[in-house]
Amino acid sequence: MFTFGILALILACSTKKDNYINRKWHSTNTKYNVLYNGNLALEKGITDVKATYSDDFWNVLPLERMQITPAEQKEGAATKNANFERAETKATKAIQIHSMNIGGYEKNNQIDESYLMLGKSRYYENRYLPAMEAFNYILYKYPTSNNVYQAQVWREKVNLKLENEQLAIKNLNRTLKGQKVTGQDLADIHSVLAQAYIKKNVLDSALASVKISKKETKLKEEKARYTFILGQLYEKLNYSDSAFVAYQEVIDMKRKSPRSYTIYSHLKQ
């Protein structure tokens, strides 16, 4: 019986056999072992990034709380963070050990998640071209994946870092015209669009996108940030009354808004 159990485990470990047991074994191990630990490391790394970030509330805030100096943006100038390195290692391990590419089709439904984590960890280390490779892999190899919209969001975030704002705008608008995107995916797409428009100083278009992101996001911190940015954009466009209303909305969020947004909303009124 013991020998039979060992044999069954060995057979289940095969990435070349397309049956339910093999698919389930590799999918489960990818999700609850490798990806779980990798995502924990990724979230810790993101927390580190946000903790070291300092907002300049007197200028229009970036939609994403991630500060990159010009030196860091140069090719090869990666930011070292053990958490991001661990996340990348876990993602690579998942792909190398648990991928079940049989007959040109991936049978492990967690591998696209692995590529998404791989791309994110590289993005936060400022390794933008390798990050884009990971996101593109999802878009081209897994066109029906639930992660397609997130892969596109992150790819266009890379394009913004590479100063390809017009390309990001073109790609995201094409997605919005061709697909029915909803919820957090829609919020994230418009947050990237808004950032691209802000960088190109097309503030009316940025305003429209921030409104959608604010409406669709399910995250309290994002909703507060986007509302504050709305106030800043209204100010830039000389819509003083609308700016006042936006800042008041932040104030009225009370504990649902980080204290810094509330303080500066009072100062802006």
Predicted segments, located by residue:
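Acidic, polar-rich low-complexity tracts and alpha-helical solenoid repeat scaffolds
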Residues: A12-Q269
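Bacterial N-terminal signal peptides
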Residues: F2-I10
